[in-house]
């Protein structure tokens, strides 16, 4: 039975405004979650508008299925496959906007049974879709110490990655960890210097979650796919919550806004330059949550919204 965990959508109005909704447009909410963005998009669409929502979390799908609206459809799957979903519906190049709200949601964090949080004891799972792939416990029990250390360093920016990885492997040899509390305790014991403002397991849990769900690869693939999916003038509106996510989004928008880089002085005809193509996107800037939103929803503090528009190139 699914409990009703509270979820406050971050940068709700700003992210939807970033799509520049047309009443008859076709939009994608790639991270349905609990439907905050989707419901606002639907409220701005006319009868001819359409909204395609995507989520890989079965609990999110259950919520989406309660929306009885002929303009709305939900897909159970990763947003990295959005180009396939669009192609199946013969909508390639016709999408007027894509919204992505990256990372883990409040209901996922707050539900101990999902295994995302070191603050609540539950099964050491961390999968966005619990029906697919390895759980965090399974991966930590089979991975090499060097691989665990690399994940903690790369995706958690954990300075004590090697020490923590060694402690995890040693603990799993004695008795395999299956609970979030066990992992949090092992990490805390292996961390020689504590940050008084942050739990010692914060970075480890983030890193393992990102790895288990292939989160950064998912983002990169979705961004790449957006170029073929969006119509000219179509918008990308993307919310990220930590520097690794935001770095990928920022770099993609910057690179696609530049167009092909030609070395200075290289002799090229006008026809050759045209063949290289122009800018794919026009970056429209970024927004951060205001003081009022952060006060009402502390989890919004680290969020960044970046918006870009597909060019006619």
Swiss-Prot record:
Gene3D superfamilies: Putative methyltransferase TM0872, insert domain, Vaccinia Virus protein VP39. It catalyses: cytidine(1402) in 16S rRNA + S-adenosyl-L-methionine = N(4)-methylcytidine(1402) in 16S rRNA + S-adenosyl-L-homocysteine + H(+). It comes from Salmonella typhimurium (strain LT2 / SGSC1412 / ATCC 700720). Specifically methylates the N4 position of cytidine in position 1402 (C1402) of 16S rRNA. GO terms for cellular component: cytoplasm. S-adenosyl-L-methionine binds at residues 35-37, 55, 79, 101, 108. Pfam families: Methyltransf_5. Its EC number is 2.1.1.199. This is Ribosomal RNA small subunit methyltransferase H. It is found in: Cytoplasm. Disulfide bonds: none annotated. InterPro entries: RsmH, SAM-dep_MeTrfase_MraW_recog, SAM-dependent_MTases_sf. One of its GO terms (biological process) is rRNA base methylation. Belongs to the methyltransferase superfamily. RsmH family. SUPFAM superfamilies: Putative methyltransferase TM0872, insert domain (SSF81799), S-adenosyl-L-methionine-dependent methyltransferases (SSF53335). One of its GO terms (molecular function) is rRNA (cytosine-N4-)-methyltransferase activity. Keywords: Cytoplasm, Methyltransferase, rRNA processing, S-adenosyl-L-methionine, Transferase.
